[in-house]
């Protein structure tokens, strides 16, 4: 029986979900646990504030409860909204992309940097990393100050990613973590430009989900 890894985009922007599907396509050679990317239709167009993040907690938990067929869930928003609540309503593993991305970055370099979408996101991310007890490994976090939609579709987003990535390198980052699921399609090109590892947190979370579902 196929038990999909369900990747949930908790905002209602379908283009973000489509971009996630493109970036995760290589994982679909796992026939037992295919990747299924879904959009939370009643979510905000972009999760850019604490209020946006809090507003999707119950809709996410309710969606998770409707999918007992899933092998695992990935919450594809860098704020990891509702991760504790979702874990409380299912026996399947639930992975948040910030938690997974940070843990992956720590395996690649002594210090990591994060590219956020907006200044308002940075404090929210730092609270979460404080909970994870990893702030001593954070070289810095710098915002692009764009919207979630622009992170995937903006005409000058890639040039801003290069600029901010180089600033984080100067601050001592040995690896860069993309702080928004919408940036996923830029990972490979950005890594080539910067010359250091660039982590897409959704790919990191799906990798962990695949590992969790390996047969004994």
Predicted regions and their residues:
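Short hydrophobic segments within beta-strands
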Residues: 8-10, 38, 115
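Short, well-structured alpha-helical segments in soluble
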Residues: 54-69, 159-172
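N-terminal beta-loop-helix "entrance" segment that forms/cooperates
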Residues: 37-61, 149-154
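Conserved beta-alpha
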Residues: 96-132
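N-terminal beta1-alpha1 ligand-phosphate binding loop
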Residues: 3-30
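Periplasmic-binding protein-like
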Residues: 7-8, 71-77, 173-180
């Amino acid at each position: 029986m196929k038990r999909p890894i369900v990747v949930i985009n908790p905002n209602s922007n379908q283009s973000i979900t489509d971009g996630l599907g493109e970036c995760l396509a290589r994982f679909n050679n796992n026939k037992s646990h295919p990747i299924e990317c879904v959009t939370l239709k009643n979510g905000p167009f972009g999760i850019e504030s604490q209020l946006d993040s809090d507003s999707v907690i119950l809709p996410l938990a309710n969606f998770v409860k409707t999918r007992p067929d899933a092998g695992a869930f990935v919450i594809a928003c860098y704020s990891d909204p509702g991760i504790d609540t979702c874990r409380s309503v299912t026996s399947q593993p639930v992975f948040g992309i910030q938690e997974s991305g940070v843990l992956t970055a720590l395996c690649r370099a002594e210090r990591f940097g994060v590219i956020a979408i907006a200044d308002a996101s940075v404090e929210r991310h730092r609270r979460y990393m404080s909970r994870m007890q990893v702030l001593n490994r954070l070289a810095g976090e710098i915002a692009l100050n764009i919207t979630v939609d622009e992170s995937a579709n903006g005409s000058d987003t890639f040039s801003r990613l290069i600029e901010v990535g180089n600033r984080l390198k100067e601050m001592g980052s040995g690896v860069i973590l993309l702080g928004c699921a919408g940036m996923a399609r830029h990972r490979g090109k950005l890594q080539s430009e910067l010359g250091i590892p660039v982590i897409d947190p959704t790919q990191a979370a799906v990798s962990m989900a695949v590992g969790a579902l390996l047969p004994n």
